[in-house]
UniProtKB/Swiss-Prot annotation:
Origin species: Homo sapiens (Human)
Name of this protein: Solute carrier family 15 member 4
Function noted in UniProt: Proton-coupled amino-acid transporter that mediates the transmembrane transport of L-histidine and some di- and tripeptides from inside the lysosome to the cytosol, and plays a key role in innate immune response. Able to transport a variety of di- and tripeptides, including carnosine and some peptidoglycans. Transporter activity is pH-dependent and maximized in the acidic lysosomal environment.
Gene responsible for this protein: SLC15A4
Segments passing through the bilayer: 49-69, 76-96, 105-125, 158-178, 194-214, 222-242, 318-338, 363-383, 405-425, 459-479, 490-510, 535-555
Positions of modified residues (Phosphoserine): 279, 298
Lineage start: Eukaryota, Metazoa, Chordata, Craniata, Vertebrata
């Protein structure tokens, strides 16, 4: 950093030296760390392949015999599961920071993940399913009746989902900062590039899973289709275990969450005590002086509090970050529709056959459309990393992470709007002509409208990820104080999970008979008597309103950050944060 007393002539050589150092760091960002980074990226690739192996066709699995859950019920279960994988992230971050360290926490969570994954091939196999669900219950769940709305075999299904969800949550909270730790001493450019390739690995795992596992599940067998992701988790455990010799690891040094809650509690109590003194006419001068200070300053030792200056400043930084995470909730609500309501919509469009070799024709897996999102990311991230970002950086035009998040919000809003327009057209066509198609041994009454009309909404979500998701990860890691990186990464994923739960709650709300947008309660998977288009338009409207709010938040945050940097560098600024 530049000294506050240096003149322009002193700052220019220093600035040139910093640029040269940055260029050197970019050239050798991963030198000597490739084995460690490779092990982290391969672990994440295998874990994501397993995750998408569960989520890509879970709606179809629960929608079909012998489970026969309604389409809305299956979508709600998947949204709840994905919400759990994110909501549990703060606990995973706390476990690593306070007890185990990141490396051991990841290993433990992968073992728990594997245990939960074993439930799904057992549920899919008839011989073991009866032991888990009860044979009498299975015989009745395929026939509509007064108990049609009940979820067949729900205890075993949700038990497996909870175990997997807790494992995913802990991996998610820790593997991202753990991977960044391998290169963080190489500077912010190395960290930015690591996040690009980390997200690239996530989507490569998704493509492998959606391309192979989803096809096997839909056209061959759910037993085999769920056994493969179980093996992937086992391999991820082995890869990460073997990488222990090359990883940069740190022992647990206390939880930032514990300090955070203590400081928040103390500051609230301190404010209350000050208010009581003012109401009694005591210490008015002291109160007037403290009111000009931050709410948290009373916690500092320099102000008579029990906490160090550094810990209090870390919590103050956290408070400034949380509004950004809150504004991302509607983004995640729309994003998670990709594997739930978008799949329901796919199953009610004309799905082409891709093979007539077998006695039963193989159809294009509905989950394959998610690959358009993943393939787009796979192609554009290297282009962005190697060409676009360097050009923008040279010209000083590289947007901040918050501006990129705002662009991502716009594209995800367009995706929900496109889905609503398509669903409106589908509902009109299905009244004129209905075709019956068998997908995964379930008969769906679909509109005579090609599945390929869904491609735009998936591509729009893919574009949104390149901006919002990657920038969100980068923001969560770079804006966090060093002592709170795991905690803030956990909070980032926590609010992502809130978005999934909001989607599940909205879906349940519009499914009640008083509203009647979703579940018709006449057919387990049929959405032809529903108004899914209204749900999509509602999501687009919520995201649009949030985008306007986020623009205000992001401008204020960027102005404050620039003001702080200018003060730190001794450069006068006329802008007010």
């Amino acid at each position: 950093m530049e000294g506050s007393g240096g003149g322009a002539g002193e700052r220019a050589p220093l600035l040139g030296a910093r640029r040269a150092a940055a260029a050197a760091a970019a050239a050798g960002a991963f030198a000597g760390r490739r084995a460690a980074c490779g092990a982290v990226l391969l672990t994440e690739l295998l874990e994501r392949a397993a995750f998408y192996g569960i989520t890509s066709n879970l709606v179809l699995f629960l929608n079909g015999a012998p489970f026969c859950w309604e389409g809305a019920q299956a979508s709600e279960a998947l949204l709840l599961f994905m919400g759990l994988t994110y909501l549990g992230s703060p606990f995973g971050g706390w476990l690593a920071d306070a007890r185990l360290g990141r490396a051991r926490a990841i290993l433990l969570s992968l073992a728990l993940y594997l245990l939960g994954m074993l439930a799904f091939p057992l549920l899919a196999a008839p011989a073991t399913r009866a032991a888990l669900c009860g044979s009498a219950r299975l015989l009745n769940c395929t026939a509509p009746g007064p108990d049609a709305a009940a979820r067949c075999c729900s205890p075993a299904t949700f038990a497996g989902l909870v175990l997997v969800g807790l494992g995913v949550a802990t991996v998610k909270a820790n593997i991202t900062p753990f991977g960044a730790d391998q290169v963080k001493d190489r500077g912010p450019e190395a960290t930015r590039r690591f996040f690009n390739w980390f997200y690239w690995s996530i989507n490569l795992g998704a493509i492998l899973s959606l391309g192979g596992i989803a096809y096997i599940q839909q056209n061959v067998s759910f037993v085999t289709g769920y056994a493969i992701p179980t093996v992937c988790v086992g391999l991820a455990f082995v890869v990460f275990l073997c990488g222990q010799s090359v990883f940069i690891t740190k022992p647990p040094d206390g939880s930032a969450f514990t300090d955070m809650f203590k400081i928040l509690t103390y500051s609230c109590c301190s404010q209350k005590r000050s208010g009581e003194r003012q109401s009694n006419g005591e210490g008015i001068g002291v109160f007037q002086q403290s009111s000009k200070q931050s709410l948290f300053d009373s916690c500092k030792m320099s102000h008579g509090g029990p906490f160090t200056e550094e810990k209090v400043e870390d919590v103050k930084a956290l408070v400034k970050i949380v509004p950004v995470f809150l504004a991302l909730i509607p983004y995640w609500t729309v994003y998670f529709q990709m594997q739930t309501t978008y799949v329901l919509q796919s199953l009610h469009l004309r799905i082409p056959e891709i093979s007539n070799i077998t006695t039963t024709p193989h159809t294009l897996p509905a989950a394959w459309l998610t690959m358009f999102d993943a393939v787009l990311i796979l192609l554009l991230i290297p282009l962005k990393d190697k060409l676009v970002d360097p050009i923008l950086r040279r010209h000083g035009l590289l947007p901040s992470s918050l501006k990129r998040i705002a662009v991502g919000m716009f594209f995800v809003m367009c995706s929900a709007f496109a889905a609503g327009i398509l669903e409106s057209k589908r509902l009109n066509l299905v009244k004129e002509k209905t075709i019956n198609q068998t997908i995964g041994n379930v008969v769906y009454h679909a509109a005579d409208l090609s599945l390929w009309w869904q491609v735009p909404q998936y591509l729009l979500i893919g574009i949104s990820e390149i901006f919002a998701s990657i920038a969100g990860l980068e923001f969560a890691y770079s804006a966090a104080p060093k002592s709170m990186q795991s905690a803030i990464m956990g909070l980032f994923f926590f609010f992502s999970g809130v978005g999934s739960f909001v989607g599940s709650g909205l879906l349940a709300l519009v499914s009640i008979k008083a509203i009647g947008w979703m579940s018709s309660h006449t057919d387990f998977g049929n959405i032809n008597g529903c108004y899914l288009n209204y749900y999509f338009f509602l999501l687009a409207a919520i995201q649009g309103a949030t985008l306007l709010l986020f623009l205000i938040i992001s401008v204020k945050y960027d102005h404050h950050r620039d003001h702080q940097r200018s003060r730190a560098n001794g450069v006068p600024t006329s802008r007010r944060a």
